[in-house]
Amino acid sequence: MNSLLFVYGTLRKHEKNHHLLAQSACINEQARTKGSLFAAKEGPTVVFNDEDEGYIYGEVYEADELCIHKLDQFFQGYHKQTVFVETDVGIKIALIYFMNKDGCAGFTKISSGDWKEHQMISKSKNPIYYFAYGSCMDNARFQKAGVDHYFQDPVGRAVLKGYTTRFTLKREDGSRADMLEDGGTTEGVLYRIPYSALSYLYKREGVESLTYRPAFVDVEAGGRHYKDCLTFLVLQKEAEIAPPQHYQIEIERGAELYLSPEFTEKLKRHMNSLPKG
């Protein structure tokens, strides 16, 4: 019998122990559950306690009994239980491997709850491939902020499968762009940026204020496959409303410069079809 499994840390896509899931189908790339992530000696590990306010970010897989048996061996000394996992298409119940709090005494807590982001920051990864799908496809605000030099090396139009561009971040003047992992296909601009550009992007996207969160996706651009590209997703998603005109202009300007005419028209039609807030 197959089970849903929530994985984090080195079991995630493109990480060093992902081969243990080689025969398992990925159900959700963007998933989270309540808890704390620690950088333990043998690798990242999850801890649950009553005070947990944060989330652990990972992926959901459908695993058979053989896969679960292999993971039981890999996670010797760990505990296993089912948890509620949040995805863009609803709540799921999945197995997770975790440690007791005492087992992580002295280990560093990964405050973001995201192993991929922790790796990017701790290794000062350079360059970074950044997938922009909203107003960052346009360079007007880059120039105004004096940071356009960070974005002078665009790879160009990129296609992301499994996601759809939506407008779920509600503001007083209208919405802002987001992506939902709902099985669709979307387009954006892939930039090659230096590590030093992150401070600007994190501030603009409101990472500290929990507006958007860093996430990682695989895209196709110029006939090549780019793995673990940085992007930003809305944390508190609401029903879609129309974006304000000034924001829509930025999106359309960037889309017309980089994206396919068919997708650009589709995106315009969608924005124009949304109700005013």
Swiss-Prot record:
One cellular component GO annotation, for this chain's record? cytosol
Report the active site residues.
205 (proton acceptor)
Query: Transmembrane residues, as ranges?
Result: none
Do you know which SUPFAM superfamilies this protein is assigned to? Answer: Gamma-glutamyl cyclotransferase-like
Task: Write down the superkingdom of origin.
Answer: Bacteria
- Binding annotation for substrate: 8-11
Q: What class of enzyme is it?
A: transferase
The answer, when asked if Coiled coil is one of the entry's keywords, is: no
Pfam families, alphabetized = AIG2_2 (PF13772), GGACT (PF06094)
Instruction: State the UniProt keywords alphabetically.
Output: Acyltransferase, Transferase
Q: Which GO terms describe its molecular function?
A: acyltransferase activity; gamma-glutamylaminecyclotransferase activity
By sequence similarity, the record places it as follows: Belongs to the gamma-glutamylcyclotransferase family.
Listed name of the protein: Putative gamma-glutamylcyclotransferase YkqA
High-level lineage: Bacteria, Bacillati, Bacillota, Bacilli, Bacillales
Q: Which gene encodes it?
A: ykqA
